[in-house]
Amino acid sequence: MAHSHDVSVCGTYILDILGVPVTEIPPGGGRLLIEEIRLAVAGTAGGTVVPCARLGLRALAVGAVGSDEKADWMLNALEREGIDIALMERMTGAPTSATILPIRPDGSRPVMHARGASARWRIAPETQVAACRSKILHLGGVGSLLAMDGAPSVALLQDAKAAGCTTTLDLIQARRETLALVEPLLPYVDFFMPSIDETSAMVGTDDPAACARFFIDKGAGACAISLGADGSFVMTRDGRQFTVPAFDVAVRDTSGCGDSYTGGFIAGLARDWDLLDCAKLATATAAIVATGLGSGANLVSFEETVKAMNTLPVRKPARA
């Protein structure tokens, strides 16, 4: 079957404005000098589509930006990455979703987010048909896609499966109540790719195997759970399971690492790799991004990422 693209990445597209290192917020009108300020295409879709493109995939961006200068920058940045933006909607009268991230010296950061076009976006019928022509369809941002959450997301994934797509799913900052949005989607999801913090918030345990089994029992074909500094855990419906340790790198900022992991995993799936190799590529992708500032930082190419996958030292896991 001929596919229009390797992957359609649907969901939240956010402009991140990052500064590092931020040791304090100066009182009043005080000034703090920092080393670097960076703009990045982010969000659970934006932070995934850029790694997909840099890892050699024909990527299609599917989402929305506003009618402001942030939208101009975002669309130009996506085009510079070689990403097809034909299905990116530009909403009149809406701001582009954006986040300010003051990164502390230890890599942690508070999040100051302004909801915008991504929260208002609902995929149009003709856009949905076009998005389902790719080999893989990824939906990212469940819980923050206020106009898409629920029945519209179910319909998108149903149509993707009916069209023969491999489907992947991610969410953002899940809470217990997010589970009600996720459950109806799982029968149409081949790979559910949350973080352990998100799964534990929904399921009530931080045991990766128990979390993965829970979501597989609800219908997911497989679950790949990112474990932060401990790597990731993968379980499939047929009983296969394994842990891939993280790589030992000098971490500067973890913004977008989970989305980069997803992008790396998708890049392996698009090449029909074994799942263990997909997870290793995903882990290397996230490790490289963690060494820089913001989503997609320091990620150069598929070849360089494979080299890192095969040569970076492995981090000793903290999780027992």
Regions found by a protein language model. Give the residues of each.
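Hydrophobic beta-strand scaffold residues
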Residues: 59, 85, 167-168
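Glycine-rich phosphate/adenosyl-contacting loop at the front of the ribokinase-like
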Residues: 1-64, 69-80, 250-252, 316-320
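Conserved phosphate/ATP/ADP-binding segment of small-molecule kinases
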Residues: 158-166, 172-241
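A glycine-rich helix N-cap at a beta->alpha junction
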Residues: 77-94
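A short, aliphatic-rich alpha-helical micro-motif
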Residues: 2, 130-132, 186
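Conserved phosphate-binding/catalytic region of the ribokinase-like
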Residues: 1-8, 33, 159, 208-320
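Conserved phosphate-binding/catalytic loop of the ribokinase/pfkB sugar-kinase fold
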Residues: 90-91, 101-146, 150
